């Protein structure tokens, strides 16, 4: 449970394990339930296109998301995958939503073992493919 008293649903954990271990999903978007007491799955996708994942993030509301990010390693060393956690808190979301999502994030992050990188986005440029790739490159020493 988080500082805000929000719990992580069993469904949310199962979906993450299906992404991480079973490669059943490419992405998961999480939200708070209507009562703001539990983090639940908003949607899952098997779509490989990163742009399709970003388009699923709401313009005016907060979400958490996990994406199985695939990228090229330099000099022909092949492809790698890193599970990326997103805290999506657009500038246009209500202050209350931003506060509840910020105070509830740690509960979800602690429950999701195997996250490689964390991204905080307030607008779409911060979650663009190149921005995320740059952050992954810095944390893995690719550049």
Swiss-Prot record:
Could you tell me the keywords of this UniProt record?
Answer: Actin-binding, Cell cycle, Cell division, Cytoplasm, Cytoskeleton, Nucleus
The record's subcellular locations are: Cytoplasm; Cytoplasm, Cytoskeleton; Nucleus matrix
The superkingdom of the source organism is Eukaryota
Q: Which CDD domains match?
A: ADF_cofilin_like
Question: Pfam families from the xrefs?
Answer: Cofilin_ADF (PF00241)
Biological function:
Controls reversibly actin polymerization and depolymerization in a pH-sensitive manner. It has the ability to bind G- and F-actin in a 1:1 ratio of cofilin to actin. Binding to F-actin is regulated by tropomyosin. It is the major component of intranuclear and cytoplasmic actin rods. Required for accumulation of actin at the cell division site via depolymerizing actin at the cell ends. In association with myosin II has a role in the assembly of the contractile ring via severing actin filaments. Involved in the maintenance of the contractile ring once formed.
| Family per record | Belongs to the actin-binding proteins ADF family.
Record's protein name: Cofilin
């Amino acid at each position: 449970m988080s500082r805000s008293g929000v719990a992580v649903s069993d469904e949310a954990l199962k979906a993450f394990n299906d992404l991480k271990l079973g490669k059943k999903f490419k992405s998961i978007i999480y939200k708070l339930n209507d009562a703001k007491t539990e983090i639940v799955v908003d949607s899952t996708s098997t779509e490989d296109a990163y742009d399709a994942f970003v388009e699923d993030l709401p313009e005016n509301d907060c979400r958490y998301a996990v994406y199985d990010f695939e990228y090229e390693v330099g000099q022909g060393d092949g492809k790698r995958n890193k599970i990326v956690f997103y805290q999506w808190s657009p500038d246009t979301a209500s202050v209350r939503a931003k506060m509840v999502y910020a105070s509830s994030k740690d509960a979800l992050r602690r429950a999701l073992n195997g996250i490689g990188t964390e991204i905080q986005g307030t607008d779409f440029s911060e979650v663009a493919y190149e921005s995320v790739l740059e952050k992954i490159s810095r944390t893995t020493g690719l550049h």
